[in-house]
Amino acid sequence: MELHRVGNAVPLDRQAGLTTAQWHEDLTFFATQLTSLHPDAFANTPKAKFDAAVAELDGKLDHLNPDEIYVGLDRIANLIGDGHTYVDFPPDSANLPLDIMRFGADSRIDMVAPGYERALGTRIVAIQDTPLASARELAATATPVAETTGLRDRRIDAHLTIGMMLHGLGVTPSRDSARYLLADDDGKQFTMDFKALAPGERTKWIHAASPLPLAEQPLDGSAACTYLRPANTLYCNVRTILQLEKPSQQMLELIHLEHPAKVVIDLRQNGGGDYNLGLQYLVRPLAEDKSINRKGHLFILIGPDSFSAAMSNAAQFRTMTRATLVGEPIGERPNTYQEPREFTIPNSRLVVRYSTRFYRFATGPENIIAPDKQVVPSWTDYKAGRDDALEWILEQK
């Protein structure tokens, strides 16, 4: 999984060179700007508690390193509560060459860079001297307080692969590497040191899943459709709600050409974009197609990583079509603040994102988009390259 947060902050050496007075100035600016720009900053955390958190960080600034200060700022931003409000990771955040996925109570390494293959598929037991459960509790303090457990868990998974975050949380002695205690499926434990990638460095990921499921295969562009002839099903993987005009045209042409019995729109790895584009190029065209917009013929795959515009479009598929939602509950709450903007903290140049507008995409007592058919992936099936949710759809008659 590629973390959703990127920023334009200055290199760490610039931040490391700041005086304590400059950090105090930055904290004051940050807290003032954030609470004045967000339309409802204290909806989920009382002002007194928010102010106390700011005062606590201010009292510690003289004794913290830049990574610890970053984590302190991000913790405060996450008290606002919505998934679009946080402090960006700067480009030099020291990403470690592994990816983590949660299967039940286990945190598994599902991807690594070359040279770390032995770690593929193992369970994480500890990071440095911190047991995994404790590391997850620490990382949870830098996740939005009002979002679902699913979204917070996915952000925790990501935090535990970022050197800057691990160092700032006090889990590792430096940001440049982390030692993981791992256990294979036979229970044998061993340690492996992961060294941080250079800023902007790309790597060729090696996957634990073999073969790689269709949903995780590389895409050239924002979306792509594949006609699965044996199942007479058109599968469209939509990774971002941007630049959808051509993929939508391809989708409609394949529907006209192949007359599929089912159409599947996969939003499970979609971090958002512009929900108006999803409405224009996905929701409305399929709603207007009488051959597809029928119960048992249109399916939307969702999960905790379906974020922002993807969440909005999933909600619209539910209300505007006869689609069946399949997978896991969406991480972001449907009735929440979105439309993020950003500001830059003057001295550290850290970038802060904040929501500007409240949206309501669901009715009823539960502020969550749950699937009509819940299918939770198991480690055994995932490792074997099976996509349980998609397979359930293909089996429907």
Where are these regions (language model features)?
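Flexible, low-complexity junctional segments that flank or bridge functional domains
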Residues: 1-263, 271
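C-terminal "post-core" interaction segments
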Residues: 1-13, 17-31, 185-188, 200, ...
